[in-house]
Curated annotation (Swiss-Prot):
Name by which UniProt lists this protein: Pantothenate synthetase
Database matches in SUPFAM superfamilies: Nucleotidylyl transferase (SSF52374)
Residue positions binding ATP: 30-37, 147-150, 176, 184-187
Gene3D superfamilies: HUPs, Pantoate-beta-alanine ligase, C-terminal domain
Entry keyword Cytoplasm: yes
An example Gene Ontology biological process: pantothenate biosynthetic process
Other known facts: The reaction proceeds by a bi uni uni bi ping pong mechanism.
Binding site for beta-alanine: Q61
UniProt-listed Pfam families: Pantoate_ligase (PF02569)
InterPro entries tied to this protein: Cyt_trans-like, Pantoate_ligase, Pantoate_ligase_C, Rossmann-like_a/b/a_fold
Gene from which this protein is expressed: panC
HAMAP family, alphabetized: PanC
Recorded catalytic activity of this chain's protein: (R)-pantoate + beta-alanine + ATP = (R)-pantothenate + AMP + diphosphate + H(+)
Length: 281
């Protein structure tokens, strides 16, 4: 397994693979890898000749009061996981490699970024789309793999790739959970013992909403009320948003008539966690 830090060096390797007509599966990450990332890597390994994992904590997708400076980093642990799952190449550039000069060009995807995390984290998806555009151009992958836990990100990236004619297939992979139901996340590392226990309220509230939907409830306000009521029973939980949106357009719906995304963002103490599920009538 190679660990490469420069765009020049990684492009030389990519060119060699392309000359040999090898397919490339790409898993973009910010590091501090866990079983959720591993599931993406395994899928990429199954479907491609070569697998690349990028590890880059992207500064332009963090807001001024967000956790960029303290975001967990552990390249040794990450490298071990990648080696275990037979990754061919880790691309781990420095910030100065990706952004050697002040950046004036940005990529925006309208409409899909108006709600959910796009509304609560201004500029976040502009940063995500911009860095992914750079990575797609540098690495030229055949397929790229994203977790469904970041459902809005997955929808935004799919639309960006469609609109800008990137010759890349975007693959969504299911949410991976702890045994007790908490969605795997690098930010779970921030939680103390009591907060970790309290964080289970996210999945519990979504399960109650799913039960109501499966029982025939079609009013999105009622579904939202079920989730809010459950979350409010947890003292350490502070709701950022609870949204029921169309799973394709990500626009709010009142009456549930087709495929929906039920998505929540909740602060447990100071840690912001997200979770979701999709439901089809």
């Amino acid at each position: 397994m190679n660990i490469v830090n420069t765009i020049k060096d990684v492009k030389l390797i990519i060119k060699k693979w392309k000359d040999e007509n090898l397919s490339i599966g790409y898993v973009p990450t910010m590091g501090y890898l866990h079983e959720g990332h591993a599931s993406l890597i395994k899928k990429a390994r199954e479907e491609n000749d070569k697998v690349i994992v990028s590890i880059f904590v992207n500064p332009i997708q963090f807001g001024p009061k967000e956790d960029y400076s303290i975001y967990p980093r552990d390249l040794v642990k990450d490298s071990s996981l990648c080696e275990k799952f037979e990754v061919d190449l880790i691309f781990n550039p420095e910030t100065s490699e990706m952004y050697p000069n002040k950046i004036y060009s940005h990529v925006n995807v309208d409409i899909l970024t108006q709600n959910l995390c796009g509304e609560k984290r201004p500029g976040h998806f502009q940063g995500v789309c911009t860095v992914l555009t750079k990575f797609f151009n540098i690495l030229n992958p055949t397929k790229a793999y994203f977790g469904e836990k970041d459902a809005q990100q997955l929808a935004v990236v799919k639309k960006m790739v469609e609109d800008l004619n990137f010759p890349i297939e975007i693959i969504g992979c299911p949410i991976i959970r702890e045994e007790d139901g908490l969605a795997k996340s690098s930010r779970n590392a921030y939680l103390n013992k009591q907060e970790r226990k309290s964080a289970l309220i996210l999945n519990k509230s979504l399960k109650e909403a799913l039960n109501a939907l499966e029982s025939g409830e079609k009013n999105s306000n009622n579904i939202r009320d079920i989730i809010v009521s459950k979350l409010n029973k947890e003292p350490l939980a502070k709701i950022d948003y609870v949204s029921i949106v169309d799973s394709i357009t990500l626009q709010s719906v009142e009456k549930i008539q087709s495929s929906i995304l039920v998505a929540i963002a909740v602060y447990i103490g100071k840690t912001r966690l997200i979770d979701n599920f999709t439901f089809k009538l």
